[in-house]
Amino acid sequence: MKKYIFLLLFACCLIFNIQAQNKIELFSPNGEIKVSIRLSDKIYYDVSCSNEKVLENNSLMLALKEQVLGEHPKLSGQKRKSVKETLTPIVPLKFASIDNEYNQLLLNFRDNYSVEFRAFNDGIAYRFITRFKKDIEVIGEDFSLQLPSEYLLHLQQPEGFKTGYEEFYSHIPSTSWKPSDRMSVLPILIDTHKSYKILVCEADLSDYPCMFLKSDGNNNITSVFPKVPLEFGDDGDRSLKILKEADYIAKTNGKRSFPWRYFSIVKEDKHLVENTMTYKLAAPNQLQDVSWIKPGQVSWEWWNGAIPYGEDVTFKAGCNLATYKYYIDFAAKYGIPYILMDEGWAKTTQDPYTPNPDVDLHELIRYGKEKNVDIILWLSWLTVEKNFDLFKVLGEWGVKGIKIDFMDRSDQWMVNFYE
């Protein structure tokens, strides 16, 4: 009898031990945010703020051609660390310095992969890390959010993967978002109707497509990605038509970290503006020499259709030399170091080496130098792709920068073009 009791107690202890191993918690440095991770058929996680559960039963997986990472995960070990440091951006956008404090949990699994979680005082993030010797094909990624109740969603919904990211935002209850509705680009903003707002976004995107989100019709949000384009056809002066796609979303190095999926969790809208999560999660700068980078304000004629008006406009306004000298004078008067010349400075959009004679770019560069105002030129990405030596040529002319436009895609090929 004692033998059976002992075996029963041993079995109970074993079960409780397994459950304890399969439930893992990570707290933010201030203890306000908690990530609860469970390992079963998938990797699940909940997010709580001040004991209020804001995200529940979310799951994550990465499907490769040969295997699915995160499916029936087998934990081989875990490592924790805490970081408290100050980051100094080369080009400050919001702050001259950024406090970067977080607690990190690295979960190592069998089959050559890990999942890394970070908990900040204003949000959480996770990413996959793989350790394969050969290149891998990524078939898809499962980013799944199960909302505990009806939330208000703020979405930008394009017609498809080809988008200029200029659609107006929709503001809809999460239960009203149908699978047949348009998907959303990132970021999306989730209003819990209670204490918190959650900004969902990604960071450190490299050699991988952008993530889009859609509804499954059950108050859940899932991920969808553009596939790798294999063949292109002509589609005007600033675009290519995708004629053939692969059955995978990325073909990439097998030993790498994947993009961060992050949630900025705030109580007040103003803290969304102050959010620096994208910068804090970005890979370290790879440039050795950054002395040539000169950030500054720019005057851009596209906003007003290149047609200035007023008592001081004593010339025929338009895409011509007099109008752009007027813009240079305006910039010089108000201490703006750059003007941006949009479409029209070149004779055609496909020839970046022949300036529009009505504009006289070389005279404008000379005139701008007299006024301490430099010039940035607009170009379509397709023109840049076909004329990569133009950077050297325009630099020799005295042009200080290029605004590359109309990418309108975010598949792996185009993301690599960004880099």
Language-model features, listed with the residues they occupy:
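Intrinsically disordered, low-complexity acidic regions
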Residues: I242-K244, Y279, K325, E343-K347, ...
